Amino acid sequence: MNQTQINETKSKKWCKRLPLLAAFLIPLLISVIICIDHEVYPFGERCLLQVDMYHQYCPFFTEFVDKLRSGESLMYSWTIGLGADFVSLFAYYLASPLNWFILLCPKGYVIEFMSILMILRISLCGLTFAYYLKKHFHTNHPAIAVFGTAYALSAFMAAYAWNVMWTDCLVLAPLIILGVEQLVKEKKAALYYVTLATAILSNYYISIMICIFLVLYFLILLLEQREGKIGACVRFAWYSLLAGGTGAVLLIPEAIILGESGSQGISFPSAVEWYFNLLAELGRQCIFVETYTGRDHWPNIYTGVFTLFLILLYLTNRGISWKKKLPRVLLLAFMALSFANNMLDFIWHGLHFPDSLPGRQSFLYSFLLLVLCFETFLHLKENRWYHVLVALVLDGAFLYAAYRWSDSELIGSDSFFTTAVFIVVYAVLLLVWYGGTAKVRDYVFLITSIVVITELTINFDMTGLDTVSRTSYVKDWKDYENVLEQAKKKESENSAVYFYRTEEMERKTKNDAALSGYYSATQFSSLMNINVSHIYQDLGMEGGKNFYCINGASPLISSMLSLKYVIADNAMEESPLRTLVASSGNTYLYENKYSLPLGFMVDDEVAERWDYKNGGGVSNQNELAELLGAQEEMLSVVPAESEVGVSTIQVTEDGYYFAAYSSVTSDTLEEEVSDGRTKSFTKASHGYILDLGYAKSGDVIRIKNSNNERVDITAYQLNMDALDTAYETLNSQTMELTSFSDRKITGTIDVEKAGNLVFSIAREDGWTVYVDGKETEPETFAEAFISVPLTDGKHDIELIYTTPGLKTGAMISLGCLILFLLSAFWRGKQEKNIVVSESLC
């Protein structure tokens, strides 16, 4: 073969790859252009952090890369709340294989790393969908790039591209579905097993929806299978089981930790409910429909206006048999119904109702719709020109009806009008195509492709890739690093082994500790220990289904949580409770006067008599102080007046003040003190005690709400004598640390009076406790914290954490992998024997 022939061969190979390459590059280019237009860093000062990407993913990614670079254990993290199992958190949020490339990323550019991965996944969606079309329909038509772009820039991706823990599954879904087709039709299992196992390992939650879809789609394939149906069922069950089992190394630890979270429990709906009418739902396939991420269940199902046209032509196409059409159209209709029906919605979402971010399976609806539309495109010659007119009339009627019965706040008139314009444009182009020569048809295809990609681009620009200020997110990082380093230096001068927690007065997220690398008592995570949230709420602190926060804690409770330092973005008022110890720029570090070590003794009587479930937050804290020896109420009521829009406290004595309030509709309360101080209390609807700070006699404290409603305030003054007494009772017997690491703690304690050694560590299955070298079954204090009964005398204490279920899961995963390899070997040997037998004949 001469050089010319070699060059021609290479050229042909590149030509064959061009549609797939275009399916990747077109979404990539569009996403980059939109980022430039939206002034995303480095093209401006914006970034793509949205919703959970802002509050969870960036902090968790930062903690992940810190652990990888420092060599710390991947089993446990102390920077996430009071401490958290990291294997389950990794499985839930970070398990994408692509995330390991974060090792190449400088720490200060984690945001950009996540943004690049977001854009990469969008582009890979286009590639894998185009690859599916190429293999499924045995075509390399350039149109696969256009349809791949439609999948990549769908409304689901516009709404949820920021949700980087989900999008690997969107990339893999076309390959998994192609794999199940190969499994049934060609008896090939490798693609199905590898892609499904990878999806399950990457994100079990979205994989549940893929698995439900696979079962339904498999039934269609089985109906179309003429012979070997039993074998197909066996293969599908066997390799699905192996794929699921391969994910056990992460699934089992994740399931155990989720069992202790706010996501535990299944409550199937008792009655059928329809969320909305189907016309309003399907109207969300129009262009410029605002993506929806709230709690009203609206799915994001736009995939291009052209699909509204092609799906009708699919129904009238004479080149596609009704035996093929009927089950696929029924599946599409079933999926559309699933968005509107509460029971089906519950099943699709893994036997849970989503807490916002609805219709999480809608990418599968978009997948199926685009596949049917592509098949229509391939068989356009089997349609007639008048079918276009019928489709035009039906689409017009649909638009009118959907507009009539849709919520104008969700789908505006501009959306319907623009959709109508595009429908007319596509109708005209199709009519020209039907009446044109082969050359004219080529031009029509080119023009239509440009129109489709333009439509998708404009919609994605208008509804996707929202931004926030990068500057405001990162501006304090260096100052935080400086003051935290000074805190470490101060502690290391006093002791070789130390433990303390730090909190912020003005936090960006409830996971700021993971962002800046310090230990805290606040977190926001779906894997959060729900018992900690419950005790926080019982004490008048901030807590919910997937978060708990130090807001509302008195100095006594803060001390029990080992909260030693407070970071403030502005200088705080003078107070006997804390001292300024460091500053950097506009960031200030204060040391609390009251802070206990990680472990401290509590009398049996206190643990037994403290009834923290039946009172309010203030009374429960007062009761604890009383049980610890306080002779007076720690938080005593002082006069306050409440009227519409404002509550007022006239300060008659120097002291530290708090306030509790009735229910409020405003999400923010503002404190104004007559000395000029101001403070904002966000998430006021969570109902926590307000820390009003130190005030002097004669000061006036006003608490205002933006909704101009009457909020009944009960004000309290902190009794320092009661606080001192309660604190000294706990501080009189504490554990001295001798070593501390991510998953192992050792210490000694000299117990003067038998009782319970309580740790400010959430009680979870992974902890093993040793007292004087003997394993001891840990108990629970306040239903949330690790507690160990101790007799009087000196004791050596050791706590070791091992992720529960990790070893069992690893063994199951390894076993399933071996079984797959053995199955593949056996299958290969069978095929070889068949070939040999045929050659002998």
List the model feature ranges, each with a label.
Residues 51, 55-66, 97, 232-327, ...:
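Periplasmic/ER-lumenal interhelical loops and adjacent helix-loop junctions
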Residues 451-474, 488-560, 594-596, 601-626, ...:
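Extracytoplasmic/lumenal acceptor-recognition loop(s) of multi-pass membrane glycoenzymes
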Residues 8-12, 631-841:
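Active-site-proximal, structured, solvent-exposed surfaces of multi-pass membrane proteins
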Residues 27-30, 118-136, 141-224, 235-260, ...:
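Membrane-embedded helix bundles of polyisoprenyl
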Residues 11-85, 468-485, 493-510, 514:
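Hydrophobic alpha-helical membrane-insertion signals
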Residues 28-129, 149-170, 209, 258-263, ...:
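Membrane-interface coil-to-helix junctions
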Residues 183, 187, 206, 326-346, ...:
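Contiguous transmembrane helix-bundle modules in multi-pass membrane proteins
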Residues 125-133, 172-184, 212-220, 308-315, ...:
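Transmembrane alpha-helical segments
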